[in-house]
Amino acid sequence: MCFRLRKQLAEAFGPVNRWFCAQAYGRPVDDPETLLVYFIRSGGAADFAARFDAAMGPLNRWYCSEFHGRDIRDPEILWNYYMNCGAPALSIAG
């Protein structure tokens, strides 16, 4: 299974999506199909795609390479750097 798919499924079946899905259904949800459908329909898949594209993009690749002191092209290293150091902070407009 490719890296991107493993990460996306981990988010779809993870505690955050599971919690939001349970809130939407009013009960705990353990069914993988229900979790996947909720993840897609609620925008989780689109959000993941945008974050993954940014993590693999040239700007993050440059910052990650600078951080490691060498050219980085490995998707897992880029993803980990983006999620830990490069993802923009969420701002809540009031």
Predicted regions and their residues:
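Polar low-complexity intrinsically disordered regions
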Residues: 1-94
